[in-house]
Every structure is written in structure tokens, then in C-alpha cells.
Amino acid sequence: MVIMIKHLASFALCAAALFPTFSQAKYQPVTIDNCGVTTTWQTPPQRVVTIGQHETELLLALGLEKNIVGTAVWFGALPPSLQSAGKGLTRLAENAPGFEAVVAQRPDLVAAQYTYHVGEQGEVATRQQFAGLGINTWIAPADCVGKSLTAGSNGDGGRDKPFTLDLIYQEIDALGKIFGVTDRARALAATLRNRVAQAQHTARDALKHNAQGNVVFWFSSTRLNGDPWVAGSAGAPGWIARTLGLTNIIHTAEEWPAVSWETIARRDPDYIVVASMARRLYPADDVEQKLAFLRSDPVTREMTAVKRNRIIVVPAMSLNPSLRNVDAVEAISQRIAAFHTGS
């Protein structure tokens, strides 16, 4: 069951009423280094194309929906509390947009969730290509700080330093300064911190009399009966596990390594967190097919988590570095509490 969390965007719905916009307050120029590119902002961006759902949701949560002129790279629907603010957004593409489609929106800023799309080998374009047209770029710090591709990593890369939500808080702070909405940014970060603290309390209460605390996070697979992409210990799911007092059974710095079901079964997780998404690039993108596989495959159906039906479904967005990591912390803590109270 997907647990929908309401808090995040309810903040955004009233943000404009609570705080003055940058047009109403004196803008303070700011210089910020972002993933190796230093930019001085003399005025806030007016026309933004977001490439990556996290960037879209972050701007919506800051009450900046009127600044978004195009979006791309969607994993699923917006959370209910952001849907009203985001209902008029233009989708240039569900996945990566073309360079021309982005430029046609006449953006003064392109904000990307992944260096894969806007980086040295950018699938959409490089930062230099955009700069040549006078377009500034922004890449989510969580996709470049402490992260790298190695000879042994897949396209998702690995982490030199474990992810924490501090990277998201840093991005909120930086974008608050860039757009001149620092009050909104501070309030959003405070709301997220309070929600994390409450989720930790819920998980501690549920686990204090129970030894079971091993977890695996399954994102997708190219084939249902092939090796699944599961979360390593240094990415966002690793932070989620540590925050809730759980132990990720996959001990690698790679973000989403492919690991055999036989290996996972030997480690026998107490909980399996499964990603739900609208994307359909691979058979295992479909959460219903994932669940059916877990309950029917001769190897997976013998795992403790499957036998006890301790499977937790969360939106895929909440397992990648984003605001929605807080949604995942809440959803997982609530389900664990329900498992151990029988509710």
C-alpha cells in the first residue's frame, strides 16, 4: 500500500501568503558555487525549465510555480499537496527532453536533478552549451557532492561520502537565496526536520521491543527474474535506513547495484521496500509485477519479509535524493509500527 504524505506541499500552498515574494522585497545578489560552476545572481530567475521531478517539486514547495516554464523527467504524479500548484505545468517530455525543446522555452535557468542530463556528458546538453546561449544552469548538489562514477559502478554511480539530508537542506537554502525567498526556504527546511524527528520517534517505539531491523530497497530490474537494482548503503535509502534505526543488507557505496536474489535471500531481510512508479521502461517498473514476483518466485517467497508480508511500497521519487526522502521516512516508520502492533 502506498502511503501518501500530505505535509510537504501543504506548506507550499500557503507559502506565497505567508512570505513576500522577491518582487515585493529587495533582492540581495548572491554568488554560489554549484557542482564546480560559480554563478553570481544579480536578479532572481524568471523562466525556469526543470529537468528532474525533484527540482520541479522543490520549486513548487517554495511557491515558485509561476517561474516554471517547462518540466521533464517524471517518475510519477506529484504528491497530492503539490498537485494544485503544479496542475498548469508544461511537460516537455516524460523522460529526457531535447535540447531544442528546452531552449524554445526561453529559460534563464535550467535546473537539473541529475548530472547525467546536464553535465560534462549531458544527455540533454552540457552546462557550457547552455551558458553559450546565456542560460544559467543548476544541478542538484546531491548528484555531485560526494558522488562519482567509478570503473565498477553502473550509470547511477557511487558515493565517496554517504548521503544525508543535509544536501537537500543545502539546496533549499541555496535556491531560497537565488530566488529571493529565503524565509520560505527556512520554513520548508524546518518543517522537514520536524517531520524526520517525528518519524524517528515512531520507528524507535516500534522497534524497541523487536530485534528485526534488516531491510532491502528494490527499485527496478531489466528482467523480473534477473538481478534487481537494489539500494547500496551510501545513497538516499541508506540514509533512510540509518535514520530509522534499520540496517541495509546491501553493503556497497554504489547507488543502485544489481544484486542476485540468491544473495538477498541469504541475507534474509525483515522488510522489503519496493518502489512504485509510472515509468515503464522495464518490466519491474510495474509495482504489481514486483509484488507478484516476490510472492511466487521459489527463492524470494521463502524470505522472512515475504512470508510475514512485511513489504512496504513507496513512490520511486522518495528513494532518490529529494524532498520526498522525508515522505519515505514517514511511510516506512508508519508501516513498521503497523506491522508490530497488528494494525
Sequence positions of predicted segments:
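Short helices/loops that flank or line small-molecule/ion binding pockets
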Residues: F99-R106, V124, V259-D268
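Bacterial Sec-exported substrate-binding components of ABC uptake systems
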Residues: V2-I3, A9, L18-E57, D160-K161, ...
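Solvent-exposed loop/turn segments at secondary-structure junctions
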Residues: H54-L58, W74-A77, L109-V110, T115-E120, ...
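Extracytoplasmic ligand-binding site segments that recognize negatively charged/polar headgroups
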Residues: H117-A125, W138-G176, L207-A236
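Short helix-initiation/N-cap motifs at beta->coil->alpha
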Residues: I32-G36, T90-E100, A253-S260
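Structured C-terminal subdomain patch of bacterial secreted/periplasmic proteins
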Residues: P162-E171, V274-S343
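Alpha-helical, coiled-coil/dimerization segments enriched in small aliphatic residues
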Residues: G76-L78, D227-W256
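A short, structured surface patch at a secondary-structure boundary
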Residues: R47-E120, L246
